[in-house]
Amino acid sequence: MSADPRHYDIVVSPVITEKATNLTEQNKVVFRVAPKATKPQIKEAVEKLFDVKVTAVNTLVTKGKKKIFRGLRGQRSDVKKAIVTLAEGHTIDVTTGL
């Protein structure tokens, strides 16, 4: 199973926070993904990039905050995250990278 270049565009980066680290005990990994990526695309990309079996994908969109910088109003970009559940016996070490 070789990774296609488009798979690297779908999975942007791993999320390394306290909550995301606690989810690894439940065999789940959290990734930032492209805003227009669908669940089947995310599943295929993770399976090909990390050579694991994915059982479920849950997604969420965090809306960007409104900010004022030097008197100008702006808004940060929305961020889409995917919580990927792995099959038993499969693990991903996100600290090593690809």
Curated annotation (Swiss-Prot):
Annotated InterPro entries: Nucleotide-bd_a/b_plait_sf, Ribosomal_uL23-like, Ribosomal_uL23/eL15/eS24_sf, Ribosomal_uL23_CS
Keywords carried by this UniProt record: Ribonucleoprotein, Ribosomal protein, RNA-binding, rRNA-binding
RNA-binding found in the keyword field: yes
A GO molecular function held by the record: structural constituent of ribosome
Top-level taxon of the source organism: Bacteria
Cystine bridges: none
SUPFAM superfamilies named among the record's database cross-references: Ribosomal proteins S24e, L23 and L15e
Keyword Endoplasmic reticulum attributed: no
Any one GO biological process: translation
GO terms under cellular component: ribonucleoprotein complex; ribosome
Pfam families: Ribosomal_L23
Quaternary structure annotation from Swiss-Prot or TrEMBL: Part of the 50S ribosomal subunit. Contacts protein L29, and trigger factor when it is bound to the ribosome.
Function recorded in the entry: One of the early assembly proteins it binds 23S rRNA. One of the proteins that surrounds the polypeptide exit tunnel on the outside of the ribosome. Forms the main docking site for trigger factor binding to the ribosome.
Family annotation (PANTHER family): 60S RIBOSOMAL PROTEIN L23A
The family this protein is said to belong to: Belongs to the universal ribosomal protein uL23 family.
Protein name: Large ribosomal subunit protein uL23
Organism listed in the record: Methylobacterium radiotolerans (strain ATCC 27329 / DSM 1819 / JCM 2831 / NBRC 15690 / NCIMB 10815 / 0-1)
